[in-house]
From Swiss-Prot:
It is found in: Cell inner membrane; Cytoplasm. It is an enzyme of class 7 (translocase). Its EC number is 7.4.2.8. This is Protein translocase subunit SecA. Zn(2+) binds at residues 897, 899, 908-909. May bind 1 zinc ion per subunit. Residues 903-913 have a biased composition (Basic residues). It is a peripheral membrane protein. Monomer and homodimer. Part of the essential Sec protein translocation apparatus which comprises SecA, SecYEG and auxiliary proteins SecDF-YajC and YidC. It comes from Stutzerimonas stutzeri (strain A1501) (Pseudomonas stutzeri). GO terms for cellular component: cell envelope Sec protein transport complex; cytosol; plasma membrane.
Length: 913
């Protein structure tokens, strides 16, 4: 009741934040004259002065006004650009670890320089994160002169970069790169076998450009480094032939069945489900194809992999459509990002779905993969000490940013008032009527000399509009995932008078449509342009620019609403940049996906009750409210899915932290002899306790079993029964000590043969390899657990609690296995001296071979579904150590050599090299 009154009196929270920062802006402005009077050298020396003051105890907040004033003055001298007051507010917002929402064309790239410069002074590194490599290079090279003028180094991390370059980039004061590359480098660092191989420093401060795209749109997409699993391409092809024989079961909302079938589709959740009839029929088909034994159930434990293939095939055929969710290019299935409309090369769907689509399209089926390391952006970016972000559209997701990342959103005022007109939506009964109205609107704008940007949700829609325009004889450009290579050229001319550009959501990120076109692109196209040519190009552009301004600026037409209001706002934001005139209009129909799936029948009945005729549109608040309600419903559902994914991944993340900490401790240690001793003690205690229960009678002891496990796990044959027969005073504790001493003696003998230094290095390599292999298998087991944990709900159990409980048990088993298997490999392995150069070359070759087999995936998953992969068969020992494990009995050093030479083993084949 009093909220509106209080807001009127004191302003909104956002207004109060902006007002607070305006005081600091005044402090920066007060220093402008002083900075103007400094020479270039004096201005540059301010950086070293700030660093010295920080070392003496001053804080970044205390030097902020001066640092911002220095950065602003350097921007004027080097770039010819002066930071506006609102940009200073944006810089302060970033420095405070918040998200700055800034409209299109307000200079986010320049804003970032303020917070980046200030935080780079601490010498701990600053990461600037972009959504693609093009923007990373563009922004780094664009701002490099400014940073280097101020004495700071700039690096760029890119895929397939030589290790030396990558390490140098991370050692720079400021590092630019994509979210994918930063995330993959983090995972790769935690697979390194020496500290020298690691690239990243401690994660200090990151500024994320297009933060909503990375932290929200990409949140459900884990980063995965994977190796190849078994090949099952033939099975995908066989299943693919069976899927078309299944029919869809269609049922109206009133429960009336309009078509009997084998499966149903839920368009809201994008899920497909076999019914009872479908299960029986697919079992018959699988049996006929020889894939399922006669009389067996598809739900038998050993057939669950087959069931997964069936569902993957169903989803590939019924939920994924060519030119909508993916395109086929160069005999490869390339996924399309629903938020940007761009293709995502290298990204593959998990759970065998990508292979099923390849089978559907008749392409070569790529092998499945097994996860070696994974994380999510949600958990990776929360590792930074301080995080900040910039975007043009964050306010609609402010609650999620605060809940998940503890990042408040501050809406930064525009430098000039927004002059764009956003017209009401026009809703038609059919898509045909809607597209006819769009063509009519385009005609009108062309006659006025206004440029038009037509935004579509899919490639199909963009090509349909293109065909309609061709039929009318209108010249136009199409920008979608098929023509992305021409993006810069098309966008550069999209603001010319009368230009018509049809684009999917691609045109929403990192691009500005300049009214009149982009004269700089024209100049760049000329080789060695003269001053006269440049002047003429500028003059021509000025005429076109004025012509478009007088006509009303850029007009944005959207052919349908997106699931997210944020994506709609991004499209609108293409028009009206920096106070320019412009307008936007959304054209909808009752046949659009969002309206069909989420808007209630009430809207349809309401429109029909009005007696609307063909071609008529409706502009009514009730319809607009229904659309916004549908969008909020979808946004809420997507938020719940992301939150659920995070809750599950948080469990794995805590385990990941423990394993990576253990790994880093091993890498940092000069030698791990004490760790090996602890592993041996714990593994031995567990083995003895399993065969000699505490406080048990000698009659209950399993001595043969203990002797067997000591040989299998510790590589030493010990006559325990003989000891007990010869010494009646031996009891549980003294026997334990005697066994431990015998194992130590055997291991010390191995150390004498190989040399202490060589064995210490070997121990570290073995423990790291065992840890990596068992962690890989643990990830696979966790995937399987998460995939089926929702079924516990049918037993009245909480799936999340069950997942936490079982994953904790699995993790305890993992830690025990690391200790036991490390000792097992070290006990069995035959160590020989090796030339250091040869050893380094061998390890390097192994690392290169491993890298060749790795795949870097950013695979789409749901909160509960992960890849169904068979865990690698390790049989108690890591693959890398198999070649080193003895299969023959151990030969004593003083025994005759088995080669038949007559010499003792230690003087023949057992001689230390």
């Amino acid at each position: 009741m009093f909220a509106p009154l209080l807001k009127k009196l004191f302003g909104s929270k956002n207004e109060r934040e902006v007002k607070r920062m305006l005081k600091a802006v005044q402090s920066v402005n007060a220093l402008e004259e002083q900075m103007l009077s400094l020479s270039d050298e004096q201005l540059r020396s301010k950086t070293e002065e700030f660093k010295a003051r920080l070392e003496k105890g001053e804080t970044l907040d205390q030097i902020l006004p001066e640092a911002f004033a220095v950065c602003r003055e350097a921007g004027k001298r080097v770039m010819g650009m002066r930071h506006f007051d609102v940009q200073l507010i944006g810089g302060m917002t970033l420095h405070e670890g918040r998200i700055a929402e800034m409209r299109t064309g307000e200079g986010k790239t320049l804003v970032a320089t303020l917070a980046v410069y200030l935080n780079a002074l601490a010498g701990k590194g600053v990461h600037v994160v972009t959504v693609n490599d093009y923007l990373a290079r563009r922004d780094a090279n664009w701002m490099r002169p400014l940073y280097e003028f101020l004495g700071l180094s700039v690096g760029i991390v890119t895929p397939f970069q030589p290790p030396e370059e990558k390490r140098a980039a991370y050692a720079s004061d400021i590092t630019y790169g994509t979210n994918n590359e930063f995330g993959f480098d983090y995972l790769r660092d935690n697979m390194a076998f020496s500290l020298q191989e690691k690239n990243q420093r401690e994660l200090n401060f990151a500024v994320i450009d297009e933060v909503d795209s990375i932290l929200i749109d990409e949140a459900r997409t884990p980063l995965i480094i994977s190796g190849q699993a078994e090949d099952s391409s033939k099975l995908y092809q066989q299943i693919n032939l069976l899927i078309p024989r299944l029919t869809q079961h269609i049922e109206e909302e009133e429960g009336v069945v309009t078509q009997e079938g084998h499966f149903s589709i839920d368009e809201k959740t994008r899920q497909v489900e076999l019914n009872e009839q479908g299960h029986q029929y697919i079992e018959e088909l699988l049996t006929q194809a020889g894939l399922l034994a006669e009389g067996e159930s598809l739900y038998s434990a050993h057939n669950l992999g087959l069931l997964t293939h069936v569902y993957s095939g169903l989803r590939a055929h019924k939920l994924f459509h060519r030119n909508v969710e993916y395109i086929v290019q160069n005999n490869q299935v390339l996924l399309i990002d629903e938020h940007t409309g761009r293709t995502m090369p290298g990204r593959r769907l998990s759970e065998g779905l990508h292979q099923a689509i390849e089978a559907k399209e008749g392409l070569q089926i790529q092998p499945e993969s097994q996860t070696l390391a994974s994380t999510t952006f949600q958990n990776y970016f929360r590792l930074y000490k301080k995080l900040a972000g910039m975007t043009g559209t964050a306010d609609t997701e402010a609650f999620e940013f605060q809940q998940i990342y503890s990042l408040p959103v501050v809406v930064i005022p525009t430098n000039k008032p927004l002059a764009r007109k956003d017209f009401n939506d026009l809703v038609y009964l059919t898509q045909e009527e809607k597209f006819a109205a769009i063509i009519a609107d385009i005609k009108e704008c062309r006659n006025q000399g206004r440029p038009v940007l037509v935004g579509t949700a899919t490639i199909e829609s963009s090509e349909y509009v293109s065909r309609l325009l061709e039929a009318e004889g209108f010249e136009h450009k199409v920008l979608n995932a098929k023509h992305h290579d021409k993006e810069a050229e098309i966008i550069a001319q999209a603001g010319r008078p009368g230009a018509v550009t049809i684009a999917t959501n691609m045109a929403g990120r990192g691009t500005d449509i300049l009214l009149g076109g982009n004269w700089e692109v024209e100049v760049a196209a000329l080789e060695n342009a003269t001053e006269e040519q440049i002047a003429q190009i500028k003059a021509d552009w000025q005429k076109r620019h004025q012509q478009v301004l007088e006509a009303g600026g850029l007009h944005v037409i959207a052919s349908e609403r997106h699931e997210s209001r944020r994506i709609d706002n991004q499209l609108r934001g293409r028009a009206g940049r920096q106070g320019d005139p412009g307008s936007s209009r959304f054209y909808l129909s009752l046949e659009d996906s969002l309206m069909r799936i989420f808007a209630s029948d009430r809207v349809k009945n309401f429109m029909k009750a009005l007696g609307m005729e063909s071609g008529e549109a409706i502009e009514h608040r009730m319809v607009t409210n229904a659309i916004e309600k549908a969008q909020r419903k979808v946004e809420g559902r997507n938020f719940d899915m992301r939150k659920q994914l995070l809750e599950y991944d948080d469990v794995a993340n805590e385990q990941r932290k423990v394993i990576y900490h253990m790994r880093n401790s091993l890498l940092a240690a000069d030698e791990i002899g004490q760790t090996i001793a602890e592993f041996r003690q714990e593994a031995l205690d567990a083995a003895i306790s399993a065969h000699i229960p505490p406080q048990s009678l000698p009659e209950q002891w399993d001595i043969p079993g203990l002797e067997a496990v000591l040989y299998s796990d510790f590589g030493t044959r010990l006559p325990i029964q003989q000891w007990l027969d010869e010494d009646e005073k031996l009891y549980e504790e003294t026997l334990r000590e005697k066994i431990l001493q015998a194992l130590l003696d055997a291991y010390n003998e191995k150390e004498d043969m190989a040399g202490a230094e060589a064995l210490r290095s070997f121990e570290k390599q073995i423990v790291l390899r065992v840890l990596d292999d068992l962690w890989k298998d643990h990830l696979s087991t966790m995937d399987h657990l998460r995939h089926g944990i929702h079924l516990r709900g049918y037993a009245q159990k909480n799936p999340k609690q069950e997942y936490k409980r079982e994953s904790f048990t699995l993790f305890q088993d993992l830690l025990e296995s690391i200790k036991r298997d490390s000792i097992r490999v070290l006990s069995h392995v035959q160590v020989r001296r090796e030339d250091p150069a040869e050893e380094e070359a061998r390890l390097r070759h192994e690392a290169e071979e491993l890298a060749k087999r790795m795949q870097f995936q950013h695979a789409e998953v749901s909160a509960l579904d992960q890849p169904e992969e068979e865990p690698a068969e390790v049989e108690g020992q890591p693959d890398v150590a198999v070649a080193s494990v003895r299969t023959e009995p151990k030969i004593g050093r003083n025994e005759p050599c088995p080669c038949g030479s007559g010499k003792k083993y230690k003087h023949c084949h057992g001689q230390v090299q």
